[in-house]
């Protein structure tokens, strides 16, 4: 419900965020990887079925591949799935997104942002009319389940890049939190707040 509401607010106001969501491993037939229901998939179907969007982009920057979304939408040309994730992390067997970018272990800020900019330029050639952004902070260097080495500032730069890229094009934008398993709970909250503050 939260991501459906957030997507409706994004249609009305241009940008919104759900302070949860991003359960991108759940599929039609059940949950997986700490994800019970795939909120982004439900919200995307809601928008499409009501004619509120015609071409949706899912930008998934969680450290884990968004295999649930890639499976759910693999035959749906109205939804484009983009996942940039750790090559060696969960799930062991990856699904095929419309665009997958696999990152090597221990990747740091500069290479991460450079890679993201490159693929954003490709995505900007398409005519999307709605964007979901899964802003997992498990790319952080201190995350228990991540394998990348992205700093606090790197996460802030990532979120700024994504929000500014689509907001400047006046494409309705809905952000959700995604994964985060930092050993320090207060740090985890601060990292997730990056998206909220920027939006």
Regions found by a protein language model. Give the residues of each.
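A general "terminal functional-core" signal
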Residues: 1-199
């Amino acid at each position: 419900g939260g991501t459906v509401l957030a997507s409706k607010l994004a249609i009305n106001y241009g940008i919104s965020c759900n302070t949860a969501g991003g359960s991108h491993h759940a599929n039609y037939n059940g949950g997986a990887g700490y994800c019970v229901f795939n909120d982004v998939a439900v919200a995307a179907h809601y928008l499409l079925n009501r004619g509120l969007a015609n071409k949706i982009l899912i930008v998934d920057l969680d450290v884990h591949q968004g295999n649930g979304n890639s499976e759910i939408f693999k035959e749906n040309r109205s939804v484009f799935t983009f996942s940039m994730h750790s090559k060696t992390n969960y799930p062991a067997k990856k699904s095929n997104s419309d665009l997958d970018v696999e990152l090597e272990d221990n990747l740091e800020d500069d290479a991460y942002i450079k890679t993201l900019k490159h693929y954003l330029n490709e995505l900007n050639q398409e005519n999307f009319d709605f964007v979901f952004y899964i802003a997992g902070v498990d790319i952080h260097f201190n995350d228990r389940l991540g394998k990348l080495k992205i700093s606090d500032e790197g996460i802030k730069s990532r979120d700024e890049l994504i929000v500014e890229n689509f907001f400047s094009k006046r494409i309705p934008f809905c952000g959700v939190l995604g994964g985060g398993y930092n050993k320090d709970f207060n740090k985890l909250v601060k990292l997730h707040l990056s998206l909220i503050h920027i939006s």
